[in-house]
Amino acid sequence: MIYIGNHVSSSKGYEAMGKQEVALGGDTFAFFTRNPRGGSAKEIKDDDVQRLLTLMKDHSFGPLVAHAPYTMNVCAAKEDIRKFSVEMLKDDIRRMEYLPGAFYNFHPGSHVGQGSEAGIELIAAALNECISGTQSVTILLETMAGKGSEVGRSFEELKEIITGLCGDKKEN
């Protein structure tokens, strides 16, 4: 089955995203988990999510795709930025459990002078810290353009990140 949808605004809540997609004729959608240029996230309201899940069932929706904010950088050189980003990643993965079977897409980040190898190790470490192996979300690493100190500029770098995951994290 092929599902087609759009990237919709999450500003009015989960059910509103679903209704907007139905109005557009789609049967899936992508959305940002939080402010794409910041770190703040709205509180999740159980009843809002339940109404979305009902709408998705009624309209035969496929899996959803959530996109992490662009500011998340789990391999940042500055420890405070890296810690904040890892906490954001943890929170986003936790939040994705409200939408079983969804995909969570994020840009690996920028090593900012540490070198690609260090960046790859930090990204794998962040994922190992955030993934329990019991979550239902599928995590997608998005390729980067490769400018500056971006990590994930090639499939080889993405493979190295995945190789750095603990075995039980990959078996889910």
Where are these regions (language model features)?
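Acidic/histidine-rich catalytic cores of soluble enzymes
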Residues: F29, A124-N172
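N-terminal pre-domain/capping segments
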Residues: M1-A66, M72, A76-D91
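Alpha-helix N-cap and loop-to-helix initiation/capping positions
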Residues: S40-D48, A76-M88, Q114-A125, S149-E160
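Conserved, mostly hydrophobic/aromatic
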Residues: E21, H67, S85, M96, ...
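Histidine-centered active-site/metal-ligand motif
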Residues: H7, H67, H107, H111
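Active-site-proximal beta-alpha loop/turn segments in soluble metabolic enzymes
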Residues: N73-V74, N105-S116, I139-V151
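Short, well-ordered coil/turn segments that N-cap beta-strands
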Residues: M1-I4, G25-D27, D58-L64, Y98-A102, ...
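Hydrophobic alpha-helical segments and helix pairs
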Residues: L89-S136
